């Protein structure tokens, strides 16, 4: 009988510890950012820069079209050597435009770098506020509603990375 009562108490304590819920919150990062004047100003500045660069590229593309149209009009009058020279000029200009596009809009281009310099400090400010909010109010996990950022905050006690590494090493 004593064993049965002892087992019941242990079982109840085990169930109680399993049922302690984690405090979870959801934050819509996109909504937060869209409602920050700093962020919208940065986006406006980035849009203006991108538009200016796109116009520059369009001007250069128009030049290539003009070069090609002129080449087509003169084609019957050109020697083989001149044809080759004109074709090479057009190809070189097209390559120059692609390089310009890449330098401005590529993955490591000027627009990406400008976005990093303008937006990253704002994002860090938001993530800092989320960390502070979660810590002060005892949240264990905070998720991004939009899903683009995934987990925004997690209590360190739920990080089992080292446990998994130890298990793999054994």
Regions found by a protein language model. Give the residues of each.
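Amphipathic, charged alpha-helical segments and their helix-to-coil junctions
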Residues: 22-170
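Bacterial Sec-dependent N-terminal signal peptides
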Residues: 1-24
């Amino acid at each position: 009988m004593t064993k049965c009562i002892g087992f019941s108490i242990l079982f109840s304590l085990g169930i109680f510890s399993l049922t302690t819920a984690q405090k979870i919150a959801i934050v819509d990062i996109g909504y937060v950012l869209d409602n920050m004047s700093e962020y919208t100003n940065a986006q406006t500045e980035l849009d203006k820069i991108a538009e200016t660069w796109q116009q520059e590229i369009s001007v250069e593309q128009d030049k290539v079209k003009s070069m090609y149209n002129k080449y087509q009009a003169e084609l019957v009058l050109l020697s083989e050597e001149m044809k080759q020279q004109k074709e090479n000029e057009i190809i070189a200009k097209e390559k120059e435009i692609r390089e310009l596009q890449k330098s401005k809009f590529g993955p490591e281009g000027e627009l990406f770098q400008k976005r990093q310099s303008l937006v990253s400090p704002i994002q860090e400010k938001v993530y800092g506020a989320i960390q502070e909010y979660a810590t002060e109010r005892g949240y264990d996990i905070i998720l991004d509603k939009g899903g683009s950022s995934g987990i925004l905050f997690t209590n360190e006690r739920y990080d089992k990375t080292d446990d998994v590494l130890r298990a793999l090493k054994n």
